[in-house]
UniProtKB/Swiss-Prot annotation:
This is Heat-inducible transcription repressor HrcA. NCBIfam families: hrcA. It holds the Pfam family HrcA. Belongs to the HrcA family. One of its GO terms (molecular function) is DNA binding. Negative regulator of class I heat shock genes (grpE-dnaK-dnaJ and groELS operons). Prevents heat-shock induction of these operons. Keywords: Repressor, Stress response, Transcription, Transcription regulation.
Length: 343
């Protein structure tokens, strides 16, 4: 049996209705709400065929139909219509661009997670850049006044750390240029996890005569190493959002979801993607705890190098069109912000 145009229109109407109501859909509902040009009896027969073909399911003998995983997949791949963002959503994204333009990467990522969770009402999980695996791209000391310097440490993943350094007397600009050259010869292209006591002692020898400055420099170096060790691998916002959906009134489904949200290893696996946007529905998620949800994932980049992934987790009946439009726009702006910082 092939799926003809009429069946496709009926399936599309059923999925749209179920996404927005959460109630199993009957033939009368489709006949009343959607102008398909056929009566409820014809729609009922077509729905039976769609169920036989695996696109619909009937949760209870006396209830209407709901989309199956196969039905959702056809909808996402072929039937879903693009949805424009609302003026309010556009305004919030513009404000996000302004607010994050000059922030450090980890703070940008946190704000991105918060905004995505707010606009989609889903749980957002972001895999952060692995700081301890990053390489130092630059470490610069800049003079503020006669007793104050600022150190700026930048990694190849775009993570930037600023620290204020207080000394009795700052070096001259000429001396500072030489000191920066020495520091960068020693540290640039070193992986952060490679900066050990031996490297620190070598740097101390290189900076003989600038003991006060070297000792002051140890603090930002230590903070960078500590942050690398403590840096969270995953950031989660809106963890409770998913429980606003009635699907998770079922205690067993709620337990499965809680188990998933607390399983970082599984979340990292489920976020893997090498595409702009990946949509996995139900059992496509290949983790038992995720078989009743959908996960939408996308990469984000710094300097055109992928450095992390973003995931949205929700029930299978999420508003795919709306969520994908929001995610695509925010990921695009996140990449623009990070790539501008890399220049």
């Amino acid at each position: 049996m092939t799926i003809d145009d009429r069946k496709i229109k009926i399936l599309q109407a059923i999925i749209n209705d179920y996404i927005h109501t959460g109630d199993p859909v009957g033939s009368r509902t489709i006949a009343k709400k959607y102008n398909l040009g056929v009566g409820s009896a014809t729609i009922r027969n077509e729905m039976a065929d769609l169920e036989d073909m695996g696109y619909l399911e009937q949760p209870h003998a006396s209830s209407g139909r709901v989309p199956s995983n196969k039905g959702y997949r056809l909808y996402v791949d072929s039937l879903m219509e693009n949805q424009l963002l609302t003026p309010e959503e556009n305004l919030k994204i513009k404000q996000y661009i302004i607010d994050t333009a000059m922030l450090e990467v980890d703070k940008i990522v946190r704000q991105t997670s918060s905004l995505l969770s707010e606009l989609t009402n889903l749980t957002c999980v972001i895999q952060t850049p692995s700081v301890n695996k990053s390489f130092i791209k630059s470490l610069q000391l800049m003079k503020v006044d006669s007793t104050t310097l600022v150190s700026v440490i930048i990694t190849d993943a775009g993570v930037m750390k600023n620290h204020i350094i207080r000394v009795n007397s700052t070096p001259t600009i000429e001396e500072l240029n030489k000191i920066n050259a020495v520091i960068n010869r020693r540290l640039v292209n070193l992986c952060i996890e490679q900066i050990n006591l031996q490297v620190i002692n070598q740097l101390k020898e290189d900076l003989q005569g600038y003991d006060e400055l070297f000792n002051a420099l140890l603090t930002p170096l230590y903070e960078t190493l500590k942050n690398a060790a403590d840096s969270p691998d995953l950031i989660m916002e809106g963890a409770t959002n998913i429980f606003n959906y009635p699907e998770y009134n079922d205690i067993e489904k709620a337990k499965e979801m809680l188990s998933l949200l607390n399983d970082k290893e599984s979340l990292r696996d489920l976020l893997k993607t090498n595409k702009d946007i990946t949509i996995r529905i139900g059992e496509e998620n290949y983790k038992p705890q995720a078989k009743e949800c959908s996960i939408i994932a996308a990469e984000y980049s710094f300097g055109n190098r992928p450095i992390g992934t973003i995931g949205l987790i929700g029930p299978k009946r999420i508003d795919y069109s709306k969520v994908i439009s929001i995610m695509a726009e925010i990921v695009k702006e996140l990449n623009n912000i990070l790539n501008n910082q890399s220049k």
